[in-house]
Amino acid sequence: MRMGIRTGAQYISGLKSRKPEIWLSGRRVINVCEEPVFKQPIREIARLYDMQHDPEYQDKITHICTETGERVSNAFLVPKSREDLLARRALFEVWARATFGLMGRTPDFLNVVLTSLYSNASFLEKYNPQWAENIRAYYRYVRDNDLFLTHAIINPQNDRSKPSHEQQDTFTHLGVVRETPEGLIVRGAKMLATLAPITDEVIIYTFPGYKPGDERYAVSFAIPIDTPGLRILCREPMQDGTRPLFDHPLASRFEEMDALLVFNDVLVPWDRVFIYNNVEAANLLYPKTGIAQQPAHQTGVRGLIKLQFATEVAIRLADSIGVDVYLNVQNDLGELLQSVEAIRALLHLAEHELEVLPSGEVMPGWVPLETIRGLLPKLYPRAVEVLQIIGAGGLLMSPTGADFANPELAADMEKYYAGRIGVGGEERVRLFKLAWDLCGEAFGQRLLQYERFYTGDPIRKRAIFYNNIKRERTLVMVDEALRMPNQQEKVVNA
């Protein structure tokens, strides 16, 4: 049965219908929807689904699927023109603004990944036509049911000096144990499955780096998050779900739980297998299917909004205590504003320097998108640093909402926590709490680490970028400069 876009209530109903094996702080979570740590993030994701039905947003972020006649998310749109890319960007922007860019793995991210796999599935036909057909069928299933995916594509950090097949245990890293008539039996672990406890399915896909001997680990597939044998081991929560929204306005709303996925002889049906036992296909999946490029459009838009939000908080923080009159503060804030505009310009360039694939699919320009990926790991930490510098000791001295609610403390709260003229005590404290969640809380430090590494090691990414540019572009101006003396000499001699 085709459904098309879901509501928030339907998303929550889906969560309630499943019983995945989730472990949190040494205990098993029985009801994910009632677990305090997950309650608010579930509400935030549900709110995004509801926006698809809101007349203010529906035509901006969804479209009528030509294949089914149902309304579906723009994340499932295979772009054939700049207008299609901008339609997808509208979705990225609306959802990112709803979360201030602080939730990096909202449903649109992996749905775009899956759409790229679908539109370029022909790449797999030379290896196994059934793999390509499986991806196409899975895309339609996720699209028509508006599912929320997580992914786990990184091996656990064990001995990184050795490939998967040389680890102490054969199945430390996720690999295939055996084949059965029903499908593959897989065992081992993958990380870093963001929001896994509150998603519908998990997709495993491959990155370059597989070596001969890694065949059993060269596997890509998707399964429901409650598949028997799949264990979700959550990291320590950054918040316990009980702290007041006044005191932690961002951390209490937008924390994305990360998890290690342990596969204990899990059955992957044959129709859910996308790659198996093929190192070459596993190494080429990332560069050949657009999953390096199309999702970078989503992460670029989200990163822009996150950087813009941090910049706006810094500006308001400086204004609230009157320090924006000082040249050094103006310099720092001007730097952040220029960073925002640089990322905005790069996104605009990516949406206009298009690449058209033989299939007719339009790709945003990879050079500006990779430039964003290289810059954000530097620019966002700098924004956090500026917040820390401007807020200084004030970030460490915020009272709680309970203090403001106590009549006996009201006069002190207003007198000693007020900002410049016109900024009351509660307003200033709420602003400082917003800043603290971004730059001081464990939640904020996780955001910082995420921005540094969500796309991989930034040093390695910049090295790859350099090598790609070196292969594609000749140093024409240097050659022209080196020829100039000879040309001048000929003119003089003549």
Curated annotation (Swiss-Prot):
Positions that bind FAD: 151-153, 157-160, 194, 457-460
Q: Which GO terms describe its molecular function?
A: 4-hydroxyphenylacetate 3-monooxygenase activity; oxidoreductase activity, acting on the CH-CH group of donors
Keywords per UniProt: Aromatic hydrocarbons catabolism, FAD, Flavoprotein, Monooxygenase, Oxidoreductase
The EC category is oxidoreductase
Q: Which residues form the signal peptide?
A: none
- What's the record's pH-dependence note? Optimum pH is 9.0. Active from pH 5 to 11.
The GO biological-process annotations, alphabetized, read as: catabolic process
Temperature notes read: Optimum temperature is 60 degrees Celsius. Active from 25 to 70 degrees Celsius.
Report disulfide bridges, numbered on this chain.
Answer: none
The UniProt annotation places substrate binding at: 105-109, 151, 207-208
**Which reaction does this chain catalyze?**
anthranilate + FADH2 + O2 = 3-hydroxyanthranilate + FAD + H2O + H(+); 4-hydroxyphenylacetate + FADH2 + O2 = 3,4-dihydroxyphenylacetate + FAD + H2O + H(+)
The record's note on quaternary structure and interaction partners says: Anthranilate 3-monooxygenase consists of a reductase component (GTNG_3158) and an oxygenase component HpaH.
Known PANTHER family for this protein?
A: 4-HYDROXYPHENYLACETATE 3-MONOOXYGENASE-RELATED (PTHR36117:SF3)
Q: What does this protein do?
A: Utilizes FADH(2) supplied by NAD(P)H-dependent FAD/FMN reductase (GTNG_3158) to catalyze the hydroxylation of anthranilate producing 3-hydroxyanthranilate. Preferred substrate is anthranilate but it can also utilize 2-hydroxyphenylacetate, 4-hydroxyphenylacetate and salicylate but not kynurenine, phenol, 2-NBA, chlorobenzene, naphthalene, naphthol, toluene or ethylbenzene.
What is stated as this protein's family in its record? Belongs to the FADH(2)-utilizing monooxygenase family.
Q: What is this protein called?
A: Anthranilate 3-monooxygenase oxygenase component
Species of origin reads Geobacillus thermodenitrificans (strain NG80-2)
